[in-house]
From Swiss-Prot:
Subcellular location(s) per record: Cytoplasm
Signal peptide (UniProt feature, chain positions): none
UniProt keyword terms in alphabetical order: Aminoacyl-tRNA synthetase, ATP-binding, Cytoplasm, Ligase, Nucleotide-binding, Protein biosynthesis
Protein's name in the database: Aspartate--tRNA(Asp/Asn) ligase
Binding positions for L-aspartate per the UniProt entry: E174, R220, H450, R490
UniProt GO BP: aspartyl-tRNA aminoacylation
Catalytic activity: tRNA(Asx) + L-aspartate + ATP = L-aspartyl-tRNA(Asx) + AMP + diphosphate
Amino acid sequence: MMRSHYCGQLNESLDGQEVTLCGWVHRRRDHGGVIFLDIRDREGMAQVVFDPDRAETFAAADRVRSEYVVQITGKVRKRPDGAVNANMASGAIEILGYQLNVLNEAETPPFPLNEYSDVGEETRLRYRFIDLRRPEMADKLRLRSRITSSIRRFLDENGFLDVETPILTRATPEGARDYLVPSRTHAGSFFALPQSPQLFKQLLMVAGFDRYYQIAKCFRDEDLRADRQPEFTQIDIETSFLDESEIMGLTESMIRKLFKEVLDLEFGEFPHMTFEEAMRRYGSDKPDLRNPLELVDVADQLKDVDFKVFAGPANDPKCRVTALRLPGGASMPRSKIDEYTKFVGIYGARGLAYIKVNERAKGVEGLQSPIVKNIPEANLNVILDRVGAVDGDIVFFGADKFKVVSEALGALRIRLGHDFELLTCEWAPMWVVDFPMFEENEDGSFTALHHPFTAPKCTPEELEANPATALSRAYDMVLNGTELGGGSIRIHRKEMQQAVFRLLGIEAAEQEEKFGFLLDALKFGAPPHGGLAFGLDRLVMLMTGAQSIREVIAFPKTQSAACVMTQAPGLVDAKALRELHIRLREQTKVE
């Protein structure tokens, strides 16, 4: 072996021993005739000292520059008093180098590895192989490896089998666009890359593999955000003969064990909250419970006011009128209120009403707002009491369709929590349960809230009679306002699956064409089953404190779904296209 130790493994217990290191020169310094090299590898850094007594080695060290690849042999020794570096794992020792081999030279990198904050992300992604040398990036990928190892260990110990499912499959409606792969041998036909292993893992349950897991690559051709990539990794889990409480208990234990092993954090039992309560109190089905702010419904106090902005929604069962109190916010300048008004407009809100509570004892005179003249004082007092308003607070209001108000004030709640540093703790895991089966569209049609294979909490007859109010056996694990994982008990009876398809507008012929294999499987003794899938990239992002999942993926795509390093996607030559029976249409020029 070319090395005896990694740099990050060196400590005082090795004092006096000979070691051989391999890595990159992170920094070179010349102090008073002595050369110091900081050597970096994936596990950390170590300081190597070369003195002029060994002329040949000293001369070699003098020629070395940053990012040269080197092999160094030397003796471990404790650093002198006052020279200990507490910021380095090996900071209590140094290596007295007496042999240095340059394994490869390096050109000057396109950006310094010590000063990266002002380097654009595109440059970092173009030279990702250099960007990943930075200790901050290496730390994230090492922690990602520890996370997957911990999860595999837990699932292996609990009787789960790691089974791979196909990457080349067929398109099924799962909510996003598919990535399509043309078939050379079947002219005009296409494979689809899987958005998830959903149907295959259900078929594994039918086949009798009652505890399955896979760390699976998934693909979705959708618009990208901070927590989205066209290809992403999923911790996919499915079980038979367990109900939702047992699946939730098992996967909660896995996450609690993971945080203890990797971050030395202990979580208590995760609280449970229904979807209805989460939307009512927080305006989100993935609430951040670190934030103490809550939405409070006040429609009952505004039904009869002479102010249509409030009275209209207050009397419409499809709308809501909601208040959000910000403690100590009465001193907020108008410019900041205007900024928040613009912010909620992103979510469809047509304005942001507010009341500043300056001195409640003075009644209406102690309130500052353009809307107080439209609301009777008795109603104002009920509203202020209900939200817990005291002097110095500001209360914001939303009045519109239920979805608009929930999303707008829910997002404002998160924004205020961060802007005013209101978060009460570092971690807040929870479960959200009792999701609706369907979302009703403007035209009265239905969309599956999770996916079409989620089991409802009712019979097929009850489901078809009252689809708008049906609840599902779905559950989401949420951490700090981020959905870590989502799952459900699946439909295991053919009649129920067909009923759900019908409600989604998928008639018998289309059912057979797209899902015939699943319906066949449900006829042959499908067991009760359910599961859950975690987004590995999001989980690592949270555990490392990264701002984007691009920071925790070795070679991510940009927000335009491109790889600037390999220049993918790229053009394909005409011969390859002919073999795939594809002819490109000329782009119409826009004048």
